């Protein structure tokens, strides 16, 4: 493979784990990119929006494993030119529990995950439990565990923490996940982590003949203030392609779309537009397939896309998108105990008229339970979602001033 052939990532790998366990530092060690780009995030030292970082994994043809695995063009052991294996995209999801919703909307975009666990703290920490449950719900089964910060504790403590990790993941989807001790800030064992990712998070087989579909994870106006009308560029949407392919010149439909007031009723109308440009990272491409975050330049009025206005929408080939739902019924499963809180609070059943938060793809919306009957709840949404029947949604309840994940449901009608 040459550089040009690997312009677009082929696999999305999420990072999960408790706040301050080193997810963003780990991604930096694997890609040389800090995924905290927003000023508020840098000031508060936390990731609020999903961050994406692309990297090319390489292999030295001379050195033995794991030291042959690298992100460098030249092997640092023997100076041989390295061979390109593949380009992957890391999705950095927020760690704080108040932002669990964003984590869930990000997990919908992951082919595999690195569960980051801080070796200096007892395992599991509350959010580590919550994130593993979230990965389990969304069906991310290909997992590698990175045991971080091994440079600041003794060998005995690392082994003790390793045993805690193995106990924690027993009987979960991460039971057979490899545990790689790593010190990302010094790039110690990064080679072993790349080897584990290559073995345990393969590139998924994708059916590119399916109709194009993409979750919109961000949208913006690229025009500077004061741009002359004749120089204005159309709105840009960014997201991950779930299936199919997209090329310049394609017509796309976006649902639920645009809010329109009709008398007292609020309706949403689908938006139709044309693709005029495609980007992966900073590289312009003619055709895009699943993998990484894709920027799509359109002919939309930039006022429609500014400040993430279209986040939570779904884009696709016209006429192929799922229905827009204002109300739906779900078969729901609630966790036994509240995960992520210091006290393991018991979760009470859903109640009629209770306000809840629903995550579907990249959409986050509030809803009210209108009825419950034999494990099936009917939910009226404040803002509709575009979702297939049998698709999975996450359910959160307001507890102590924040939304906390309490379970999930499958849309049944």
Regions from the PLM with identified roles:
Residues 5, 167-310, 314-321, 326-336:
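Conserved catalytic-core segments of large NTP-driven translation/proteostasis enzymes
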Residues 118-120, 141-159, 179-190, 312, ...:
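G-domain G4 guanine-recognition motif of GTPases
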Residues 12-15, 153-155, 167, 302-413:
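C-terminal effector modules of nucleic-acid-centric enzymes and ribosome-associated factors
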Residues 20, 26, 45, 92, ...:
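Residue-level signature of catalytic and energy-coupling elements of molecular machines
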Residues 84-89, 93-100, 107-130, 136-160:
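Conserved Switch II/interswitch segment of TRAFAC-class P-loop GTPases
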